[in-house]
Each structure stands twice: as C-alpha cells, then as structure tokens.
C-alpha cells in the first residue's frame, strides 16, 4: 500500500492581503457659525458621537441635519457630551 501526502496550501498564488473597504466620508460637514438651509447635513457619524440639539434632526444612520434655516452652533452637553444646534439668529459671544 502506497500513501500519497499532498500539501495543505497551494504552492503558488498571490498574497492574501490587498483588500480595503471604501472610505465612508464621515465627519463634520458644516462648521460652527456657518449659515445652513433646512435639510443640510451637519455631521455624518457612526453612533451618537455628537448629539442633536435645538432644530437638529437625526437620521437612521445617526446623521445630523438642520431642521430650519439658521446658524450652526456646536455646544457642550453636560461634562462629556457634545451637541450641535441650529439657531435662526447668530449667537453673539458675551464678554
């Protein structure tokens, strides 16, 4: 009886690397103080890294968008959270 052993791996071929996914283009799309129209996307994100504030809606993929025409304001929400709001008038910094 003759026993023939074969290699587990194929002897030749390309490497098993060389794949990458397409970038998702996430991040802040409108900056603080910028005028936006209702429906404009403010932030594209995965999870609620930034929370919706006044006059801001949230999509099923956690995208934040303006509900009214106005000015974008990034604010703190408590100690460790951020939120973005849209106000009809520009907020003036108090001195």
Swiss-Prot record:
<keyword id="KW-0687">Ribonucleoprotein</keyword>
<dbReference type="GO" id="GO:0022625">
    <property type="term" value="C:cytosolic large ribosomal subunit"/>
</dbReference>
<dbReference type="GO" id="GO:0006412">
    <property type="term" value="P:translation"/>
</dbReference>
<protein>
    <recommendedName>
        <fullName>Large ribosomal subunit protein bL27</fullName>
    </recommendedName>
</protein>
<dbReference type="InterPro" id="IPR001684">
    <property type="entry name" value="Ribosomal_bL27"/>
</dbReference>
<dbReference type="InterPro" id="IPR018261">
    <property type="entry name" value="Ribosomal_bL27_CS"/>
</dbReference>
<feature type="propeptide">
    <location>
        <begin position="1"/>
        <end position="6"/>
    </location>
</feature>
<dbReference type="GO" id="GO:0003735">
    <property type="term" value="F:structural constituent of ribosome"/>
</dbReference>
<comment type="similarity">
    <text>Belongs to the bacterial ribosomal protein bL27 family.</text>
</comment>
<keyword id="KW-0689">Ribosomal protein</keyword>
<dbReference type="Pfam" id="PF01016">
    <property type="entry name" value="Ribosomal_L27"/>
</dbReference>
């Amino acid at each position: 009886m003759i026993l023939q052993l074969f290699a587990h791996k194929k002897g030749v071929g390309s490497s098993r690397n060389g794949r990458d996914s397409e970038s998702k283009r996430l991040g802040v799309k409108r900056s603080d103080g910028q005028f936006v129209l209702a429906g404009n996307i403010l932030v594209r994100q995965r999870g609620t890294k930034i929370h919706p504030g006044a006059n801001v809606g949230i999509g099923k993929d956690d995208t934040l968008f303006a509900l009214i025409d106005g000015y974008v304001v990034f604010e703190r929400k408590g100690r460790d959270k951020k939120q973005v709001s849209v106000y009809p008038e520009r907020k003036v910094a108090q001195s």
